[in-house]
Amino acid sequence: MIPATCTLSQITARLGGEWRGEDISVTAVRPLADAQAEHISFLANPKYKAEVHDSSAGAIIVSAKAADGFEGRNLIVADDPYLYFAKVARLFSPVVKARGGIHPTAVVEPGATVPASCEIGANAYIGANTVLGEGCRILANAVVQHDCKLGDEVVLHPNAVVYYGCTLGRHVEIHSGAVIGADGFGLAFAGDSWFKIPQTGAVTLGDDVEIGSNTNIDRGAMSDTIVGNGTKIDNQVQIGHNCKIGSHTVIAAKTGISGSVTIGSYCIIGGGVGTVGHIEIADKTTIGGGTSVTHSITESGKHIAGIFPMSTHKEWARNAVYIHRLSEMNKRLKTLEQQLSDSKDTQ
């Protein structure tokens, strides 16, 4: 456990990198503009270089290339300053471990397995035949229904809900208001009404998955909806039934993924994206915020953007410029048409 105050040499001993200048003590990470002498900050983007000169930060995390411009400052030189900053921030943000015990108002149904190392909060509910791993934290008013399986050190924040039969891997974190395993939107038209299709699958989340507040991941119609290891999903995201999401993909807020969509690994999906159902998105695809994805993306590594029609980011950026010039172009077109008409009249 690193102390609340630590020196630059202690940080580099834990995380690597090279410290330069004085081996000062720091107490927290702060932005360049707010940092004081007891803080460490970082420069990840060269366009903010001027802020370093004005910053009162006691130490700054920089790349080797940027370090040459800051002689006389206390530095930590790292290959990736932004990643290094994240790791330093983690050092100063203690991970809350489970305090073993079950609150008197919690309900643990017969047949549930709850190790002594787990923390079960006030009014939490653990269903029958559910198995919790070591060190889980099921906080106030959270619900884990029957026949679920949770790995070690899973955290359910207050009012999170995991429906029956779902599986969560190790170190999964579900934030408040999220619902894992509610019924998928499966309906068959019966001529004059809709007949609900029973959703008999479940949801499987891999290890190190994080689900934001008020996000919904629907259970599969017949097979499980799956989210791979290390994937992070923001607040207020809807994942439809039967979706398969690969490992280490990130999905930003307000995105809606329709049913039976397959998303690869290491994808980046911006906020407010919408997809049609039953399509595939290749590994390492980047989708810009607000994009409407209307067909499969089969080539890995593509950067896609645009509300409609979907296109590559390069094509979308070019077309966006044209959209802003449509009025001007229309006037020019009318002028040219008039000139052409006048020319014909004089012939």
From Swiss-Prot:
<dbReference type="Pfam" id="PF00132">
    <property type="entry name" value="Hexapep"/>
</dbReference>
<comment type="similarity">
    <text>Belongs to the transferase hexapeptide repeat family. LpxD subfamily.</text>
</comment>
<keyword id="KW-0677">Repeat</keyword>
<dbReference type="InterPro" id="IPR020573">
    <property type="entry name" value="UDP_GlcNAc_AcTrfase_non-rep"/>
</dbReference>
<dbReference type="GO" id="GO:0009245">
    <property type="term" value="P:lipid A biosynthetic process"/>
</dbReference>
<comment type="pathway">
    <text>Bacterial outer membrane biogenesis; LPS lipid A biosynthesis.</text>
</comment>
<feature type="active site" description="Proton acceptor">
    <location>
        <position position="241"/>
    </location>
</feature>
<comment type="subunit">
    <text>Homotrimer.</text>
</comment>
<dbReference type="InterPro" id="IPR007691">
    <property type="entry name" value="LpxD"/>
</dbReference>
<comment type="function">
    <text>Catalyzes the N-acylation of UDP-3-O-acylglucosamine using 3-hydroxyacyl-ACP as the acyl donor. Is involved in the biosynthesis of lipid A, a phosphorylated glycolipid that anchors the lipopolysaccharide to the outer membrane of the cell.</text>
</comment>
<protein>
    <recommendedName>
        <fullName>UDP-3-O-acylglucosamine N-acyltransferase</fullName>
        <ecNumber>2.3.1.191</ecNumber>
    </recommendedName>
</protein>
<keyword id="KW-0443">Lipid metabolism</keyword>
<dbReference type="Pfam" id="PF04613">
    <property type="entry name" value="LpxD"/>
</dbReference>
<keyword id="KW-0444">Lipid biosynthesis</keyword>
<dbReference type="GO" id="GO:0016020">
    <property type="term" value="C:membrane"/>
</dbReference>
<dbReference type="InterPro" id="IPR011004">
    <property type="entry name" value="Trimer_LpxA-like_sf"/>
</dbReference>
<dbReference type="InterPro" id="IPR018357">
    <property type="entry name" value="Hexapep_transf_CS"/>
</dbReference>
<keyword id="KW-0808">Transferase</keyword>
<keyword id="KW-0441">Lipid A biosynthesis</keyword>
<keyword id="KW-0012">Acyltransferase</keyword>
<dbReference type="GO" id="GO:0016410">
    <property type="term" value="F:N-acyltransferase activity"/>
</dbReference>
<dbReference type="InterPro" id="IPR001451">
    <property type="entry name" value="Hexapep"/>
</dbReference>
